[in-house]
Regions:
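Asp-box/WD-like beta-propeller blade repeats and closely related beta-sheet repeat scaffolds
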Residues: 91-157
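Residue-level detector of Asp-centered blade-edge/turn motifs that repeat once per structural unit
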Residues: 9-11, 56-60, 109-112, 162-163, ...
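Short loop/turn segments immediately following beta-strands, especially the blade-tip
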Residues: 31-38, 83-89, 128-136, 181-185, ...
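Beta-rich catalytic cores
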Residues: 24, 50-52, 102-104, 154, ...
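Surface loop/turn motifs at the tips and blade-to-blade linkers of beta-strand repeat domains
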Residues: 44-48, 95-99, 143-150, 191-195, ...
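Short glycine/acidic-enriched loop and turn motifs that connect beta-strands
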Residues: 21-24, 69-73, 121-124, 174-175, ...
Length: 244
């Protein structure tokens, strides 16, 4: 969501809405919302298949969208697309194959010019480069997770740590949070969540000291102290039930 510039800056706010291609949805909608009276109007629409999760890069003035499908250009799996933000419309730049079905989360590591895509069905974390114009470059790494007992990994979210040293990954299938070295992509830490809790989303606090994890199945918020110089890199300090 971004604020409009000009004389209406205080009144209108721009936002982007991603949708699944069901019940007549066209794709990604650009909306303008009046922050004073709640009025909403559609500014533009770009056709896009199953582009439900979006990420806006303020640095590059680009929007990135996962393509939550099981087929990409005739190949099994989904994709990820890049769009240039131009006033009240989005202009398609390019798209890339996501190496698995149902990619569900995308975020940019702005400092490393990389794009992190979480692929739910196949348990993949795919890292792409970002080109100078904001388009998606070649993949740098494809990381796959699977337990020896046959349980399937379902990566639901990933994000860079505030210090840029690691990538935090939420595995909804195996009930883990992982930390990977952002340069070597080697796993350096793991935290086992309660069985069938379903880690889904991750966010760091503005000061970078805490990580928040939302569990989909147990309806809880887990709070961790992020301490990268300690053996226990993520220390669980609080659990909040959202059912209360």
């Amino acid at each position: 969501m971004t604020k409009l510039k000009g004389k209406d800056m205080e009144k209108w706010m721009k936002c982007y809405v991603g949708t699944n291609s069901l019940r007549g949805s066209k794709g990604i909608y650009t909306l303008e919302i009046n922050t004073q009276n709640g009025e909403m109007r559609e500014a533009s629409t770009v056709e896009a298949d199953d582009s439900a999760y979006l990420y806006v890069s303020e640095k590059r003035k680009c929007l990135y969208a996962v393509m939550e499908s099981l087929e990409y250009k005739g190949v099994p799996g989904g994709g990820v697309a890049a769009y240039r933000i131009e006033d009240n419309k989005l202009s398609f730049l390019n798209s890339r194959y996501a190496y698995g079905g149902w990619p569900c989360h995308v975020i940019a590591d702005e400092e490393k010019d990389s794009l992190l895509v979480s692929v739910f069905r196949n348990g993949l974390l795919v890292v792409y480069g970002i080109n100078q114009d904001g388009s998606i470059g070649e993949e740098r790494r494809v990381e796959h997770h699977q337990e020896p007992n046959g349980r399937m990994s379902h990566i639901h979210a990933s994000m860079p740590t505030p210090d840029g040293k690691y990538i935090a990954v939420a595995d909804c299938g195996l009930d883990y949070i992982y930390l990977y070295d952002a340069k070597t992509y080697q796993k350096v830490f793991e935290w086992k969540a309660p069985e069938d809790s379903g880690p889904r989303q991750l966010r760091f606090s503005p000061d970078g000291k805490y990580l928040y994890m939302v569990s989909e199945l147990s309806c809880q918020i887990f709070v961790f102290e992020y301490q990268p110089d300690c053996k226990d890199m993520l220390r669980n300090v609080q659990v909040i039930s959202t059912r209360d």
